[in-house]
């Protein structure tokens, strides 16, 4: 989480304008920007810590979906509805690592992530399309930003009338 410990080529992370500074969780520093010492990503459990491009995330989703990374039964378990009473009465639910919205016999599934200085979303639609967006900042009103971004990405997807047939990873 310290600025001088990033990977080669890793972006700089920015907090929102006017964001308060943080008391560093690392020895030797006192007051720091939140993205660089306000929390210790190194000691977090299952949240955060990935350094990836949007293409990397899409390759990951494609590999999940293809059966090359995990078995189809494992993916089915990951996106299955949790046991009652969790998420009862909701149009979507949290499976194992994915938010899931059923759509007929399939589902849209997605994951968002956000810490000071970062925001990400990756979506896989019920019919196999996927997209990802990564930001090296997190707005002050992250919930409003998340909704606006999600709506804009769905609008873009729904506006496409002809999709390429070639492998976009090549």
Label for each model-derived stretch:
Residues 1-108:
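Short, surface-exposed loop or secondary-structure junction motifs
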Residues 41, 138-140:
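A short acidic/small-residue loop/turn micro-motif
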Residues 96-97, 115-123:
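Short glycine-rich, acidic/polar surface loops and turns
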Residues 102-104, 115, 126:
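A generic beta-sheet turn/junction motif
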Residues 110, 121, 134-135, 143-146:
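Short conserved micro-motifs at the rims of enzyme active sites and ligand-binding pockets
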Residues 119-125, 129-138:
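Short, well-ordered beta-strand elements
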Residues 140-170:
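Short, gly/Ser/Thr-rich active-site loops of penicillin-recognizing serine hydrolases
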């Amino acid at each position: 989480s310290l600025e001088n410990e990033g990977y080669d080529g890793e972006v700089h992370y920015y907090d929102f304008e006017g964001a308060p500074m943080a008391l560093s969780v690392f020895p030797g520093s006192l007051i720091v920007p939140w993205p660089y010492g306000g929390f210790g990503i190194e000691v977090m459990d299952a949240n955060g810590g990935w350094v990836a491009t949007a293409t990397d995330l899409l390759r990951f989703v494609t590999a999940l979906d293809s059966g090359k990374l995990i078995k189809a039964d494992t993916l089915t378990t990951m996106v299955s509805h949790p046991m009652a009473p969790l998420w009862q009465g909701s149009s979507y639910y949290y499976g194992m690592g994915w938010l899931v919205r059923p759509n007929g016999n399939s589902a849209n599934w997605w994951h968002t992530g956000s810490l000071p200085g970062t925001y990400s979303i990756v979506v896989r639609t019920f019919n196999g399309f996927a997209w990802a967006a990564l930001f090296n900042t997190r707005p002050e009103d992250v919930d409003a930003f998340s909704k606006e971004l999600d709506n804009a990405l769905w609008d873009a997807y729904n506006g496409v009338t002809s999709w390429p047939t070639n492998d976009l990873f090549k």
